[in-house]
Amino acid sequence: MDRRTVLKSTHIQQKIAEKKAELENLNEIKKFTSILTNQLDELENKLDYMAEGTESVALVLSNWQNVVKSVSLASLGLLKYSEKDYETGAPLPECLVRIKLDKDDNVGEEIQEKEEMETDDYISDQQAEESENINEEEDRQEVQTSYTD
């Protein structure tokens, strides 16, 4: 009997040791699961932040095409100048018109009126210059026809 009791007690001690090892493994799994959960939460936050950033980049890129078109339109006016115009100085591209978006902004109205006046003056100067060029061309043609007569 003594031997049976010893066998039972060693068997019980062995099972207790196995259960302790299993408990340690489960505690370790729980610890690693907690760490993994924290890392996944951090990853989620970073992905949300990246998603917001990509939305901002997408907005900028969608507007970039409009910026390029505006610059292109402003530069088209440079094509009408001749080499003589470049001798006095490089001509500037066409002015871009600003459109007021806020109706309650009085300062914006003043700025817009000033810009419109400058644009009108610029257009008037351009038209006067063009009519002057046309008059000079007509005078040349008249002089040439008078020599041929």
Swiss-Prot record:
Residue numbers spanned by region Disordered: 107-149
UniProt entry tagged with the keyword Cell division: yes
Subcellular location: Nucleus; Cytoplasm, Cytoskeleton, Spindle; Chromosome, Centromere, Kinetochore
GO BP annotations, alphabetical order: attachment of spindle microtubules to kinetochore; cell division; mitotic sister chromatid biorientation; protein transport along microtubule to mitotic spindle pole body
InterPro entries recorded: DASH_Dad2
UniProt KW keywords: Cell cycle, Cell division, Centromere, Chromosome, Chromosome partition, Coiled coil, Cytoplasm, Cytoskeleton, Kinetochore, Microtubule, Mitosis, Nucleus
Keyword Chloroplast: no
Compositional bias per record (Acidic residues), positions renumbered to this chain: 107-140
GO cellular component, one term: mitotic spindle pole body
Pfam family of the protein (one): DASH_Dad2
Primary location group: nucleus
Coiled-coil spans in chain: 7-56
Protein role: Component of the DASH complex that connects microtubules with kinetochores and couples microtubule depolymerisation to chromosome movement; it is involved in retrieving kinetochores to the spindle poles before their re-orientation on the spindle in early mitosis and allows microtubule depolymerization to pull chromosomes apart and resist detachment during anaphase.
Oligomeric and partner information: Component of the DASH complex consisting of ASK1, DAD1, DAD2, DAD3, DAD4, DAM1, DUO1, HSK3, SPC19 and SPC34, with a stoichiometry of one copy of each subunit per complex. Multiple DASH complexes oligomerize to form a ring that encircles spindle microtubules and organizes the rod-like NDC80 complexes of the outer kinetochore. DASH complex oligomerization strengthens microtubule attachments. On cytoplasmic microtubules, DASH complexes appear to form patches instead of rings.
Family affiliation: Belongs to the DASH complex DAD2 family.
UniProt name for this protein: DASH complex subunit DAD2
Organism, as annotated: Debaryomyces hansenii (strain ATCC 36239 / CBS 767 / BCRC 21394 / JCM 1990 / NBRC 0083 / IGC 2968) (Yeast)
Gene name linked to the record: DAD2
